[in-house]
Amino acid sequence: MSTVNELVNLVDETYDISQIEKEIGLDNIALSDLELLATGGYSPLTGFLGKKDYDSVVETLRLDNGSVWSIPITLPVTEEVAKSLKSGEEVKLVNGGNVYGVIQIEDIFVPDKEKEALLVYKTTDEAHPGVKKLYERPNVYVGGAIVLTKRFENNPFPSYHLDPIETREEFKKRGWKTVVGFQTRNPVHRAHEYIQKSALEIVDGLFLNPLVGETKSDDIPADVRMESYEVLLQNYYPKDRVFLSVFPAAMRYAGPREAIFHALVRKNFGCTHFIVGRDHAGVGDYYGTYEAQEIFTNFTVEELGITPLFFEHSFYCTKCEAMASTKTCPHGKEDHVILSGTKVRELLRNGEIPPSTFSRKEVVEVLIKGLKKEVVTG
């Protein structure tokens, strides 16, 4: 494992794989994890977790060496594949007929998935998308150090797909000493904009880092979201103080634990601060409104290496005639227009136009166009 904030780099496209015969098939989650492990997005991790680290992360939110890490990054294989593997050997990592990397197997073990579900997601309910995915994936985990031997060619957003070393360079070039990261899997609505701009008042730059890996089927498609971010930044943000780049990970929907994970990853991308809002990375009613903020009290800023910025739920207040939160607005609920991505999706699907207090008109236009395309192609 590398030291804090030193980036892992495990990309080697000249790596000789000609003598390696065995292979493990990667699903899309493992494939995106492979890339993020190799490019340093998941520093200090250098591979898929072995049993010791896996148990430690699941039980204590720390690696075996004590470093904070909250989400188990695992490589699941079927019992049949596991039987053909042994510790110490090198195996190719394959997806869609292409070899993307190699793993040096250190560990082959059967996890207690129920325990993982309960501790990581706080539920064993299979209606929870993270738990559902956990149970759907094969039942044996393979741990070991990896090498990425081939970069992905079919990247849907090449100009926005930057490795941590590149985003760090970009922030340096812009002279940003302090950078706040914002994680999103939804179009940015007025509530998000208010929070981002509040944070931008106290730091040099905003890093808008939308997740474009695997999400729930009813989440708005990544290409539509990317276009919505572009029009928003073009029209409503100072260009020299915002940087947009994608986060190619899968969404886990692990709420509080994922908030810690998202913060650690943004530290690797070069952020000094990270925004944690209401029900960060949550789904349904599985987590308390501010549970994702409360979990940070278990760790010091020093050991996280990044400062979390907590925001209350914001809304449009008809009396204040402005965006506000309970910290800044004295008025009652009856004056508050509550904004949420879910609400906007609902309005759009019913053919209604969200009011300008919800969403900027340029964003709404992009979403309507995207929804029409979805209906035609869907």
Curated annotation (Swiss-Prot):
Report which reactions are catalysed by this protein.
sulfate + ATP + H(+) = adenosine 5'-phosphosulfate + diphosphate
Instruction: Kindly list any coiled-coil regions of this protein.
Output: none
Please give the superkingdom of this protein's source.
Answer: Bacteria
Tagged with keyword Transcription: no
- Entry keyword Disulfide bond: no
The pathway this protein participates in, as annotated, is: Sulfur metabolism; hydrogen sulfide biosynthesis; sulfite from sulfate: step 1/3
Q: Which family does it belong to?
A: Belongs to the sulfate adenylyltransferase family.
A Gene Ontology annotation in the biological process aspect, one of them, is: hydrogen sulfide biosynthetic process
* EC number of the protein: 2.7.7.4
Q: Which gene encodes it?
A: sat
Query: What keywords is this UniProt entry annotated with?
Result: ATP-binding, Nucleotide-binding, Nucleotidyltransferase, Transferase
Q: What is this protein called?
A: Sulfate adenylyltransferase
* A UniProt-annotated Pfam family: ATP-sulfurylase
Name the top EC class: transferase
